[in-house]
UniProtKB/Swiss-Prot annotation:
Family: Belongs to the aromatic acid exporter ArAE (TC 2.A.85) family.
Keyword Disulfide bond: no
One GO biological process term: carboxylic acid transport
Cellular compartments per GO CC: plasma membrane
Protein name: p-hydroxybenzoic acid efflux pump subunit AaeB
Keyword tags: Cell inner membrane, Cell membrane, Membrane, Transmembrane, Transmembrane helix, Transport
Underlying gene: aaeB
Pfam families the record matches: FUSC
Keyword Transport: yes
Lipid bilayer topology: Multi-pass membrane protein
Chain segments annotated as transmembrane: 7-27, 32-52, 61-81, 87-107, 115-135, 148-168, 365-385, 402-422, 426-446, 450-470, 478-498
Molecular function, one GO term: transmembrane transporter activity
UniProt main location, coarse: membrane
Superkingdom of this protein's organism: Bacteria
Length: 650
């Protein structure tokens, strides 16, 4: 019960503290501080599906401060440059908002929040100044907005610190053990080589859990810098987990063509179940002893899996203790250079930026042309929704959430505006109870992810006259309520009308990147061979899982290419100038497949790559390359021929 009530109490405290401190400091519009506290605390909890872990709210608050400062500077620059042309000024703000949304769609989700804020903060400041009829007051509005927003953020952070936030460390400690057991179960399924569907489900679940563990590492670093050693171990643990998935899947794949790949003694040993991490540790000891005895007949993939699992267990002890990194661990951590993944959603990001610009620009032009009294509220809501919704995996659902919320905010805001707030003017305690009750009920519903709740809370606070002094002008209330509802509805219509058709394009680009990774692994350059692309490849595989849920064929293609990349990266390719030059040629052709725009050219380069792979196989035979090199190259060439149409055009 305490866990359930902690976040509603935290949100209530943040809202009331922001309101009272805002009035005490004589801020002109304390409602901006209250609304900021609600968005920072409520938005974090809505995303987490409950009370967020320690550090998440502070990190989000810092990003909001950074975004607000950037937005204020942008508003001042735009105003100084175009003070004599209000239309140009508003259009530049719309372009700035679209640019920020485009850029935020390309970077890490954790950091994109600051750019989203920077985009609509500039728009809000200029729109507010324009609505008041004094563009020369933009610097004053910028300072006021900064003060109010920072106050709201500090109140949210203070509430988070007082009401004992949860640490994610215990969850990580339990997950690393549970993940090892799941890895052993996947290896059992792959060695048994029976149910293909069950194997697909098992490795798909492991990819998701490994990705989730990587996200937990980011969350842990938000909590405190004292987890630095644990974070380094977790980063390498992510690579080891992905390596184990790859080796297990390759074991299954090899048995399709070589049923006798796994010797009987290994099959018998792998039949024993392991329910806990301690059981897996015992099975690992037995496997290592068997490998030491029969070193000449041990399957290569099984040996690689055992090596990765042994290092996994070693790092797990350090993760739980957070002790100093030993020399042995340091050797594991510095063995490879992790390469970050480039975004494959360039077209998706462009669509998001265009949606934001079109929505805000149309609203600006209509407002300036008609002189609509609700225009400023509509513009503010357009900027907020388009900036926040576009960063979500499903912008349409986020926009619907705001539409539902703004619809509820009209009667709820009217109740507060006409009956509750006027009766609290003589008592600060009654005012705190009224706002606190709104925050408490909203907090209960937000942590359950009740659709429309976050929008309703923000919309209700926005239409209330939490200003200094309070003035109950019913016409102004109607204007604000109507403006923000129309703004949310227009944002929804823009998302529906400007459709995002980049799904197939992104899927094809991802599959071709897997192909390029497999081809580029054929190299004799030692620096290139040290580059660890595995986390980036699985990050893109996770994106593919989200883009095409249930399309198991695409997952199998991607996983097969990742397996090919890992096997070729470890292969003992003969070192000579002829092969090195041909490796560069293969990489160039594979890169052209990704970069060209037309399907005809893409098909031409793909067919050229297949011919070059045939020539490469002849070269390997000529230079007496070992089976560990020729076999994965042959498998890669056959796989590319089989799925040529899928890789060229989804």
């Amino acid at each position: 019960m305490t866990e359930f009530l902690r976040f509603p109490i935290k949100l209530t405290f943040a809202l009331v503290a922001a309101l009272m401190i805002g009035f005490h400091l004589n801020l002109e519009t304390p409602r901006w501080a209250v609304m900021t506290a609600g968005i920072v605390a409520g938005g974090t909890a809505f995303a987490a599906g409950g009370d967020p872990y320690s550090g998440a709210l502070r990190y989000r608050g810092i990003l909001r401060i950074i975004g607000t400062f950037i937005g204020c500077v942008a508003a001042l620059v735009i105003m100084i440059a175009t003070v004599r042309a209000p239309v140009v000024m508003l259009l530049l703000c719309c372009i700035w908002a679209g640019f920020c949304v485009w850029l935020s769609s390309l970077i890490k989700v954790e950091n994109s929040y600051a750019l989203g804020l920077a985009g609509y903060t500039a728009l809000i400041i200029v729109v507010t100044a324009n609505a008041s009829g004094g563009l020369t007051l933009v610097p004053q509005y910028a300072v006021e907005r900064c003060s109010e927003i920072i106050l709201g953020i500090l109140c949210a952070i203070l509430a988070d610190m007082i009401f004992s936030p949860r640490s994610i460390k215990k969850v990580i400690d339990a997950e690393v053990d549970s993940l090892l057991v799941a890895h052993y179960r996947l290896l059992q399924l792959c060695v048994a080589h029976e149910d293909k569907e069950e194997v697909d489900k098992a490795w798909g679940a492991l990819v998701r859990r490994t990705t989730a563990l990587s996200s937990m590492r980011s969350q842990l670093m938000m909590e405190s810098s004292r987890w630095q050693n644990t974070s380094r171990r977790l980063q390498m643990l992510n690579t080891l987990s992905l390596t184990m998935i790859t080796q297990a899947a390759e074991t299954f794949l090899i048995q399709n063509s070589r049923p006798d790949y796994i010797a009987t003694q290994y099959r018998v040993l792998m039949e024993k179940e392991a329910a806990t991490a301690e059981d897996v540790h015992k099975r690992m000891k037995a496997l290592r002893r068997l490998i030491a005895v029969s070193s000449k007949t041990v399957p290569e993939t099984l040996e690689s899996w055992v090596e990765a699992a042994t290092e996994y267990q070693l790092l797990t002890h350090g993760i739980k203790s957070n002790g100093r990194i030993t020399a042995l661990e340091e050797g594991i951590l510095q063995r490879e250079v992790v390469i970050q993944a480039r975004s494959a959603e360039n077209h998706h990001a462009m669509i998001n930026g265009v949606r934001t610009f079109v929505a805000t620009a149309l609203g600006s032009l209509f407002w300036l042309y008609t002189g609509w009294t609700s225009g400023s509220g509509c513009m503010v809501m357009l900027g907020v929704i388009t900036a926040l919704a576009m960063r979500m995996p499903n912008p349409l659902m986020m926009a619907k959430d705001f539409v539902y919320g703004m619809t509820v905010a009209v009667p709820l805001g009217a109740l507060y505006f006409m009956y509750i707030l006027p009766n609290t003017q003589q008592s600060a305690v009654l005012l705190c109870i009224a706002i606190g009750l709104l925050g408490f009920i909203s907090g209960i519903l937000i942590q359950r992810r009740q659709i429309g709740t976050l929008g309703a809370m923000v919309g209700t606070i926005n239409v209330l006259v939490l200003d200094n002094p309070m003035q109950f002008n019913f016409t102004q209330f109607i204007d604000n309520a109507l403006g923000q509802w129309i703004g949310s509805f227009v944002a929804l219509m823009v998302i529906l009308l400007i459709r995002d058709k980049s799904k197939a394009r992104t899927g094809r680009k991802l599959l071709n990147r897997f192909m390029y990774a497999a081809v580029s692994a054929m190299t004799t350059n030692q620096a290139r061979r040290r580059e660890n692309h595995l986390p980036a490849l699985y990050q893109q595989l996770f994106l593919l899982l989200n883009l095409f849920p249930g399309d198991i064929d695409k997952y199998r293609i991607a996983l097969t290419l990742i397996i090919g990349h890992q096997r070729l990266r470890a292969a003992d390719v003969p070192v000579n100038a002829d092969l090195s030059a041909y490796h560069r040629q293969l990489r160039h052709t594979a890169d052209r497949i990704i970069s060209v725009r037309s399907d005809e050219k893409r098909r031409y380069y793909f067919e050229r790559l297949l011919k070059e792979l045939d020539v490469y196989q002849h070269k390997l035979a000529h230079y007496d390359a070992p089976t560990s090199v020729t076999e994965p190259v042959t498998r890669l060439a056959e796989m590319l021929k089989k799925y040529q149409n899928t890789l060229v055009q989804i």
